[in-house]
Amino acid sequence: MKKISLLIITLIVFSGVSFSQNTFTLSSTDLGGQATKTEEFSGFGCEGENKSPQLSWANAPEGTKSFAITMYDPDAPTGSGWWHWVVFDIPANMNELVTNAGNINLNLVPKGVIQSITDYGIKGFGGPCPPEGHGLHKYEITVHALKTDTLGLDENTNAAVVGFYLWNNTLAKASIVSYYKRDNK
């Protein structure tokens, strides 16, 4: 009985290793654990460059038909957080967004990829800009593997509605977290 238990535990452990090698992942060559002035928003009292970070993802689950990217600050003093970036209808054959792809004027994403309204009221990337002295804010950047080619939404759709559609169509998601704060001047 002891040998059977050991065998089962061994199989579970090694099964976990093989699964972890195929885990859906998100990474960035631009972000460490701390956002910088490069990503910081330009406006709302912030004076950053407002460049979206490079993002790449790997090992999407079988059945993935498209991707979406979101950037969200759960620490924003709004009662509902703050959506900084909402990108969807990314083709399933893509696995990267280059640095500054969130600048809709540069056309760094393929036609058909939609960058909709953020909580700043703009389309495209709106970088971190926490209130001065509010402490460290957490920024969750997430790639969603979707079971549909398109969400059927447009660039004027607000983040909450996009989030609802993502919730209904996500097969898997992977996230990275970055932090940012602004001290009192």
Please name every model-derived segment.
Residues Q21-K185:
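N-terminus-centered regions that define maturation/targeting leaders and the start
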